[in-house]
UniProtKB/Swiss-Prot annotation:
It is found in: Cell membrane. Plays an important role in integrin-mediated signaling and functions both in regulating cell migration and immune responses. Promotes formation of focal adhesion complexes, activation of the protein kinase PTK2/FAK1 and subsequent phosphorylation of MAPK1 and MAPK3. Promotes production of pro-inflammatory cytokines by monocytes and macrophages. Plays an important role in modulating inflammation and T-cell-mediated immune responses. Promotes axon growth in the embryonic olfactory bulb. Promotes attachment, spreading and dendrite outgrowth in melanocytes. The keyword Zinc does not apply. Changing R461C: Results in JMH-variant phenotype. Residues 1-44 form the signal peptide. It is a lipid-anchor; GPI-anchor. It comes from Homo sapiens (Human). This is Semaphorin-7A.
Length: 666
């Protein structure tokens, strides 16, 4: 990558020296030790590495990895079958079929499904927003708002087959929070069937053996996030788990406004024996999901998204549940739970606020042979639906995997095996800025931590990410915005510069060094060089020392204003400008500007000479830039003056905010 050139400003008179800060007072030894221990603990948790190490713009291959909609799509839904090169996207009155064949140009076909209802009060209400796409035996099921008359269609070999109005399959408005879950011939939904009544949200079985719904009192203004069916050891014990957040029943002013929950239902629930319970779920229980860090006193109580990663051995209890949470300041945390822990909480916990002996069978217990739940058991669970025990994250500390100042909204996780055989879990998290963070979960090594590898810009034009789907077979990520659909590789090894050291310092388990290139482990038939030492990966390279930066020279007149700019390729490194063994400027990790800039306000004779921009990242040290400032001669001055005039506008405007901030701080 070509670094931005240094810039020059007009000469100025010398400035009076400003007194430096007062001498630093010594801290007591005990306090210094406590601060060191706190810093070490924070580093071990990975919070200091929660920001992305590098920033990458995914340009893709021309014509192959991005396709525009051709119109603005404010609401999209994406359907992708693992291993397929095709992606279905539902939009406004249309269903798009994108095809991304390997190594060939992408294509798009459009199926029009316009509104069939002509009368509507608002133009926006006249649209048919497709909100559901699902593969069924009859074809691809597409359901939409249809001018506030929710309806469905089957797409069969490019033909649209109307199915008429189907309440519960699509909301009346695309802005409504909704979930629809399919399992065989069964359909579960949180969508209300009537537009102007029944406004209390419910979780329903709308197709199956018997229609059921949750009691109106067991949830308070829920926002549904995810639902799944878990097949347990006995078929009658199969569970429906759904994740949501709701208003906090604790009205203490210091209590959070929202709490995050997981609810359980028995899939074989047939309703109750009494008139009050015959049409209701009789096995509903809910538990609080905890995602907090006691060491920093940070609580994250707003669940944003959930991703379930099944265990490769097929053990349902070892399924990992990744939850993305936020707090009122839109900082985020990722907490990981196990289905086994969730199941144990529901099986063994007492009920919150209930102090008598539990009835038999206990609330939430699934019964064999589709037996109805006794009325007493239903009444206790209906009045006390929350279990007392909370669901805590996995691990001995019961803390978040990591937390971050970024606002994450969606998550997908890929389990992969590196070249040396170690298994990694790689998280892909969307931000509210329309980017994707690629984070490696800590391994089993001592002192390992979550590592944020990079931030990816997936679109041609910046926009919010509406949908995301991960294909583990093709190793692709599919994301959509209001403008386009993009196919992003999971590896992206070509973005790492700096030779072998830069490749291994990325700590990207998808990438390795082979035959002078940083390549994907999937593109090589033999084992590639990867680091097995997460603390000092650069030491695995054949040449232990990175190459020195090439010397660049510039001639300047005395008393000139000038700046030297060094691109901060790694945001986890400290960049320093050194001149005659003195550090003139230092830019720490988290520095807001993409460049570390040394501003020379008034060039004196002592300030001519060699300037080195040096990057320090752990034990890895490299020389990023090397400049020599020379006294100006007539010929060189004329050449440089012309060059500076040509670049003055763009360069000066680009660095002016950073220079202003630097001068104010100075």
């Amino acid at each position: 990558m070509t670094p931005p050139p240094p810039g020059r400003a007009a000469p100025s008179a010398p400035r009076a020296r400003v007194p430096g800060p007062p001498a630093r007072l010594g801290l007591p030894l005990r306090l210094r030790l406590l601060l060191l221990l706190w810093a070490a603990a924070a580093s071990a948790q990975g919070h200091l590495r929660s920001g992305p190490r590098i920033f990458a713009v995914w340009k893709g291959h021309v014509g192959q990895d991005r396709v525009d909609f051709g119109q603005t799509e404010p609401h999209t839904v994406l359907f992708h079958e693992p291993g397929s090169s095709s992606v279905w996207v539902g939009g406004r009155g249309k269903v798009y079929l994108f095809d991304f064949p390997e190594g060939k140009n992408a294509s798009v076909r459009t199926v029009n499904i316009g509104s069939t209802k002509g009368s509507c009060l608002d133009k926006r209400d006249c649209e048919n927003y497709i909100t559901l796409l699902e593969r069924r035996s009859e074809g691809l099921l597409a359901c939409g708002t249809n001018a506030r008359h929710p309806s469905c269609w089957n797409l069969v070999n490019g033909t649209v087959v109307p199915l008429g109005e189907m309440r519960g399959y699509a909301p009346f408005s695309p802005d409504e929070n909704s979930l629809v879950l399919f399992e065989g011939d069964e359909v579960y939904s949180t969508i209300r069937k009537q537009e102007y009544n029944g406004k209390i949200p419910r979780f329903r079985r709308i197709r199956g053996e018997s229609e059921l719904y949750t009691s109106d009192t067991v949830m308070q203004n829920p926002q549904f996030i995810k639902a799944t069916i878990v097949h347990q050891d006995q078929a009658y014990d199969d569970k429906i788990y759904y994740f949501f957040r709701e208003d906090n029943p604790d009205k203490n002013p210091e209590a959070p406004l929202n709490v995050s929950r997981v609810a359980q239902l028995c899939r074989g629930d047939q309703g109750g024996e009494s008139s009050l319970s015959v049409s209701k779920w009789n096995t509903f229980l809910k538990a609080m999901l905890v995602c907090s860090d006691a060491a920093t006193n940070k609580n994250f109580n707003r669940l944003q998204d959930v991703f379930l990663l099944p265990d490769p051995s097929g053990q349902w209890r070892d399924t990992r549940v990744y939850g993305v949470f936020s707090n009122p300041w839109n900082y985020s945390a990722v907490c990981v739970y196990s289905l086994g822990d969730i199941d144990k909480v529901f099986r063994t916990s007492s009920l919150k606020g209930y102090h008598s002996s539990l009835p038999n069978p206990r609330p939430g217990k699934c019964l064999p042979d589709q037996q109805p739940i006794p009325t007493e058991t239903f009444q206790v669970a209906d009045r006390h639906p929350e279990v007392a025990q909370r669901v805590e994250p996995m691990g001995p500390l019961k803390t978040p995997l990591f937390h971050s100042k970024y606002h994450y909204q969606k998550v997908a996780v890929h389990r992969m095996q590196a070249s040396h055989g170690e298994t990694f879990h790689v998280l892909y998290l969307t931000t509210d800025r329309g980017t994707i963070h690629k984070v490696v979960e800590p391994g089993e090594q001592e002192h390992s931590f979550a590592f944020n590898i990079m931030e990816i810009q997936p679109f041609r034009r910046a926009a919010a990410i509406q949908t995301m789907s991960l294909d583990a077979e093709r190793r692709k990520l599919y994301v959509s915005s209001q403008w386009e659909v993009s196919q992003v590789p999971l590896d992206l090894c070509e973005v790492y510069g700096g030779g072998c050291h830069g490749c291994l310092m990325s700590r990207d388990p998808y990438c390795g060094w082979d035959q002078g290139r940083c390549i994907s482990i999937y593109s090589s038939e033999r084992s590639v060089l990867q680091s097995i030492n997460p603390a000092e990966p650069h030491k695995e390279c054949p040449n232990p020392k990175p190459d020195k930066a090439p010397l660049q020279k510039v001639s300047l007149a005395p008393n000139s204003r000038y700046y030297l700019s060094c691109p901060m390729e790694s945001r986890h490194a400290t960049y320093s400008w050194r001149h005659k063994e003195n550090v003139e400027q230092s830019c720490e990790p988290g520095h807001q500007s993409p460049n570390c800039i040394l501003f020379i306000e008034n060039l004196t004779a002592q300030q001519y000479g060699h300037y080195f921009c040096e990057a320090q990242e752990g034990s890895y040290f490299r020389e990023a830039q090397h400049w020599q400032l020379l006294p100006e001669d007539g010929i060189m001055a004329e050449h440089l003056l012309g060059h500076a005039c040509a670049l003055a506008a763009s360069l000066w405007l680009g660095v002016l905010p950073t220079l202003t901030l630097g001068l104010l701080v100075h």
